[in-house]
Regions:
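Glycosyltransferase catalytic domains, chiefly GT-A lineage
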Residues: 1-197
Length: 197
């Protein structure tokens, strides 16, 4: 149903007129929201930024279930949403962001820094590892303050990672693995931050 689909589009100075020309092809309600982020080290932080502003302007959606996902996916079939309306947050399974993945980088400072930014303890992550997920979310009641913290934590985590990257590489190399083989999926920052908040 077109009225149930809300597409959030960010813009900096003004909306490109081409968007208006092509709105008739869009299968949903388009909301143009100005990108007023003060920090943009982590470009995907635009997502929580747009969502927090949308929720502030549309508080009626706090009592609605929302299916949030990126625009670059295609569904063969939609999930059975009715079976998911149980007050919990549902996520797609994404083992590439679970606790074991982070620990596999052999960097005690890395995991400590990541959890400290969000304010969660490692024991909670380990206990809930089987529930790790992201990329697509089904939730209710996550408003402005939640998404504002997610936006701020994304920027802190991403920037903090690069500020201490050499330390993480040193710890990785100290475990006997070639320092040049170090890699870490920091692009998933927002997935950790949403999950851990």
């Amino acid at each position: 149903n077109k009225e149930d689909i809300h597409i959030l589009v960010g813009y900096k100075q003004e909306v490109n007129p081409i968007w208006y020309q092509n709105l008739h092809t869009v299968h949903g309600i388009v909301h143009f929201i100005q990108d007023e982020r003060l920090t943009t080290h982590y470009l995907p932080s635009i997502r929580p930024h747009l969502i927090k502003k949308f929720m502030m302007r549309n508080p009626q959606f706090l009592s609605e279930y929302i299916f949030y996902h990126d625009a670059d996916i295609l569904f063969g079939n939609l999930p059975l949403f009715e079976g998911m309306e149980d007050g919990r947050v549902h996520v797609s399974r994404t083992p590439y962001i679970d606790y074991s993945y982070i620990i596999s980088k052999n960097s005690p400072s890395l995991i400590k820094d990541l959890v400290d930014i969000v304010g969660i303890d490692q024991e909670t992550l380990l206990k809930n590892e089987a529930n790790t997920g992201g990329a697509q979310y089904f939730f209710k009641g996550l408003g402005y303050s939640f998404w504002d913290k997610v936006e701020r934590d994304c920027e802190k985590m991403f920037r903090g990672y690069f500020d201490k990257l050499e330390t993480y590489k040193d710890e990785f190399a100290a475990s006997g693995i070639d320092r040049t083989k170090y890699d870490f999926q920091i692009w998933t920052t927002d997935m950790w931050v949403v999950l851990w908040n």
